[in-house]
Amino acid sequence: FVMSALGAAVAGALLPTVLRAEQPLRILVLGGTRFLGPHMAEHALARGHTLTFFNRGKTNPGVLPSVERIQGDRNGQLDGLKGRKWDAVIDNSGYVPRHVRLSAELLKTSVPHYLFISTVSVYASFAAANDEDSPVGKLADATVEKVDGETYGPLKALSESAAREVYGPAATTILRPGLIVGPDDNTDRFTYWPARAARGGEFAAP
């Protein structure tokens, strides 16, 4: 059921209409206001689901004002989530395994399913095609929490493990998307290139 909600969010722009969910869900979104989150939320709302955002309230605080907000911090300031129940949680802002473990442990008894948005960057190598069982990158120091180009993938892999360890494989869904592009992409990792190519002439490309 969570996959259908997220699938509508990620692929909904390709659909002529958004189908209403047979069983509307109460969904908690950790993060949810930067790039992917608002698109996901709009389509989940269109399907009839009820959303709650949990975040620090700093990034795009005015986006989707009709959605309930609980302000807090992944770094231990989770009190606003206590005593509440949802049908599923979508972790859209988990980059450090300690943060993922904290939220998963708090929510395990009140939210039956944990969906973690990971990344293809978890894989140790791209020399061959990867699948769910392919080796993931590892950190020399598992206590590192600084997120940069070298640690991003391994930290996401450790975060996946944290979610599974707390919720168990049956109640955990891990998504490993590749490069996501589209409206409001704040990274400009892809959109620059077709725009530059459309201008014509020679240009350097990676």
Task: Annotate each predicted stretch with a short phrase.
Residues 1-21:
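N-terminal export signals
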Residues 173-194:
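Flexible, glycine-rich beta-alpha linker
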Residues 84-140, 157-165:
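NAD(P)-cofactor binding segment of oxidoreductase domains
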Residues 54-58:
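N-terminal Rossmann-fold cofactor-binding loop
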Residues 144, 195-206:
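A conserved pocket-lining segment of Rossmann-fold NAD(P)-dependent short-chain dehydrogenase/reductase
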